[in-house]
Regions:
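Mixed-charge, low-complexity intrinsically disordered regions
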Residues: 1-96, 105-157
Length: 157
């Protein structure tokens, strides 16, 4: 997909664009078969809700399964001054974010502060653990001692 219009309208430096993705989904629009498989799932609704929380500044962090990065041979997020474009469930740009902090901790060691920064539900660690455990169990990867990539970010546009 081409994000030139969004980049231009928001006066972003095209040379600092890293990638575009949606919370819970990644970027299935790069592969139409993957997008069709995910279409109309709960993840599409959740992607919209989380993108809106980020746009409003209520969500300033996210978390992922470290082993997923390894399996997918994906680079870890990094603090490098570049930005990502957050997409909605239709693959449309919602906002641009830049990573401000990245660290890896065990699932059972994720802090209440990180849970609050994720901006979801009642902002408690108990809620964060419940929904993230459910999410990781869906993919068969949950373990209390699994490594979690915690990323903090700020909206830049």
């Amino acid at each position: 997909m081409n994000y030139d219009k969004f980049i231009s309208e928001h006066r972003l430096n095209p040379e600092k664009f890293r990638e575009a993705w949606a919370f819970c989904l990644g970027n299935p629009w790069e592969n139409p078969e993957e997008a069709d498989a995910l279409n109309d799932t709960e993840y599409f609704k959740e992607a919209d809700e989380l993108a809106q929380l980020a746009l409003e500044g209520k969500k300033t962090a996210t978390a992922g399964d470290f082993s997923e990065y390894i399996r997918e041979n994906s680079p870890l997020p990094k603090v490098d001054g570049k930005y990502d474009i957050v997409l909605n469930s239709k693959g449309e740009p919602v906002c641009a974010i830049t990573t401000t902090k990245v660290y890896i901790v065990k699932f059972n060691e994720v802090s209440a502060e990180h849970a609050r920064k994720e901006g979801e539900g009642d902002l408690t660690l108990a809620y964060w653990r419940q929904v993230h455990e459910e999410f990781f169990r869906t993919f068969g990867t949950f373990r209390p001692d699994m490594d979690i990539v915690c990323e903090e970010f700020q909206v830049i546009s």
